Amino acid sequence: MSRCISNNEIETLGQALMKQYIETMNLKHVFCMDIEGFVTDFLGLPIEYESIAEEQTGEEKETKKLGFLSDGITKLKVVLNGIVQEVTYPRDTIVIDKMLLNPEESGRKRFTIAHEAGHYIMVKHCSLSAQASFHREFDSTAVYSPRMMKQLYDMNERYANRAAACLLLPADLMSRLIRSFNKGRPVRIFPGNVLAEKEKLLIKKMADAAGTTNATLFYRLRELHLFQEHPMDEYLRECILKKGVVYAKDLPFI
């Protein structure tokens, strides 16, 4: 993309799109957004599920290509009838790897669909020519070359990731989740992004209700300033140190 887009721009676009979709489909009380319905019925983009077989050699072998947004020109390697074939999909077709149809992969599938929709929205927003794009999943345990890190953290990918999170978890929905699961209070967090088991369970419950991964829910809480940082002493007292021990700050001369 030829210009920088602010997070506020992406947030506003995502919120406006989802608000219109929610009102159109009467989904005001739903926690789990129908992202496939949003993409196919609202944006008008077809979704295909195929076994993506793009070669991943050398520096790319650690990344798995899970999704693809077609520009109508770039060929995609997929497995059809047991044979790897190059297919040119119609422009703006989203192709998702079949492995994500596994029920256990629902959160990843939904994020991948939203990510490719994010690319489409950003292209429209910036009035750019369509460009084919892949969604690669970052593996925190892998060692990436500088070139692969650049691809993974490419500006366009960051925009699409932010847009995906906004579509799956718009601000209004996040507010409803907080009201329903945490009595409207911000989620407690400690320095260094440390979470107590209670808050980890809370995030999992909200993520399950919204049909997203824990990581996506966590990032949205952070992006929307829905965390409240508490002192590390509180965490140590509650989760690490033995009860009944006298701590230095409790002594009258400290």
Model-derived features: positions:
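Active-site hotspot residues in diverse enzymes, especially metal/ion-binding acidic/histidine motifs
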Residues: 1-254
